[in-house]
Amino acid sequence: MKGSISYQIYKGALLLSALLNSVSAQQVGTLTAETHPALTWSKCTAGXCSQVSGSVVIDANWPXVHSTSGSTNCYTGNTWDATLCPDDVTCAANCAVDGARRQHLRVTTSGNSLRINFVTTASQKNIGSRLYLLENDTTYQKFNLLNQEFTFDVDVSNLPCGLNGALYFVDMDADGGMAKYPTNKAGAKYGTGYCDSQCPRDLKFINGQANVDGWTPSKNDVNSGIGNHGSCCAEMDIWEANSISNAVTPHPCDTPSQTMCTGQRCGGTYSTDRYGGTCDPDGCDFNPYRMGVTNFYGPGETIDTKSPFTVVTQFLTNDGTSTGTLSEIKRFYVQGGKVIGNPQSTIVGVSGNSITDSWCNAQKSAFGDTNEFSKHGGMAGMGAGLADGMVLVMSLWDDHASDMLWLDSTYPTNATSTTPGAKRGTCDISRRPNTVESTYPNAYVIYSNIKTGPLNSTFTGGTTSSSSTTTTTSKSTSTSSSSKTTTTVTTTTTSSGSSGTGARDWAQCGGNGWTGPTTCVSPYTCTKQNDWYSQCL
């Protein structure tokens, strides 16, 4: 389940792109230039990874919104200026968004690493942030993940209860919606076009217009509110986590790409009818603690959150190709040079350690949850979003809708200790966002070493009884683009400690057209996943 995405900023909101006349449009301001911090990532093949030079942009809900004729705020606290913004159309013409002041948000990058700080105070106070990976200054990077894997390193050691360092994909437009909605002149350069499976209604602008009509300020969030419109699209939550709990969760939608909804028909966190929309707001989540494995993840546990680790997510298809139907989502971890598989569920009636349609149906039945996942297309529905190509989101937030209890505590709060699926972590149910903000202002998350490529191409590691050595050589290659540099990194890994010959643990060992090894090093067994893919497990 995914909670509210009500990210906070204490004095500001959205401005959008410039037109030179008074027609309705999202305007671009001129008070602060928009610049994008550099962030590298890697594309991998079976034997090498190519480093790609990208950058990140902060979501357009963060920068201050002011009048096009001066510096008067269009949005202060959680309220629109009634003169500048009497309605959606007029507000879009009167107001503009400038570049984000990253020194105020204290979002920092270094090489392939991104750090997001929780509470920051400069000229104004900011809570959390949401960023997108860019291909170039005006286009989001799109990822096609079917029959691929996605890997990144994360440090959650400074994320306590009540916080969510979320890394995920959404099916938003690569240009931020500029082509579809000509009144949006800001686009991806300024972080516009966000959508997710909650169909968020707290966005200040959607589809080139303001979200003023029907705006109701939040009662418990001094920076946010809810408008008449929401922005929907398929969402693949690779990682929602703090140092106590984590979850991987696909959320399909009837229409995978970005669409605008109205009022209660949006469903999700922001509507009285949670299941009244066209997306699955709950998703099908694999949280190890919720699945009965309470000693797998956390400080000092199998995955020790006191230290950084690698997260690997694989997207298998029914025919082993990038054009097939999504059939399974697998999860691995690497920590201390050791590959660690996702734990097996211990819930009665729910077996396995990966997400499939049958696993999701069994989990929904065991927990008594509404099966919106199946209703909105299940794995095939999620795969349709992945086939579109999705934008990478990296964020840190707290939850003014349900206090993040759905991730790391007991939810619903009136559940008993024997209620199936209610226990999601060890955190207390009594905390509130304002307490989290005042108690842990220095919390932060670090994402780094992002890689994508064919299955088993982005990570290496042994087991407790094996050791490995890695030799890496690099060379730079020129490109025709002045904005992008590609570096080829060739990695050779030699392992010892496992007896016999064959494919290493977790590697491919069979499938239609497979020409590599068909046996596994001891003690692993070549296990068939489908006709096109077998793996050493």
From Swiss-Prot:
Positions of the UniProt region annotated as Disordered: 458-503
Top-level division of the source organism's lineage: Eukaryota
Substrates-to-products reaction catalysed: Hydrolysis of (1->4)-beta-D-glucosidic linkages in cellulose and cellotetraose, releasing cellobiose from the non-reducing ends of the chains
Linker: region residues: 454-477
Broadest EC class assigned to this enzyme: hydrolase
Gene Ontology process terms (BP): cellulose catabolic process
Glycosylation sites: 136, 414, 456
Keyword Hydrolase applies: yes
Gene3D superfamilies xrefs: Glycoside hydrolase, family 7, domain (2.70.100.10)
Domain CBM1: 501-537
Alphabetized UniProt keyword annotations: Carbohydrate metabolism, Cellulose degradation, Disulfide bond, Glycoprotein, Glycosidase, Hydrolase, Polysaccharide degradation, Secreted, Signal
Compartment annotation: Secreted
EC number: 3.2.1.91
SUPFAM superfamilies noted in UniProt: Cellulose-binding domain, Concanavalin A-like lectins/glucanases
UniProt entry tagged with the keyword Hydrolase: yes
Family per similarity comment: Belongs to the glycosyl hydrolase 7 (cellulase C) family.
PANTHER family associated with the record: 1,4-BETA-D-GLUCAN CELLOBIOHYDROLASE B, GLYCOSIDE HYDROLASE FAMILY 7 PROTEIN
Annotated protein name in UniProt: Exoglucanase 1
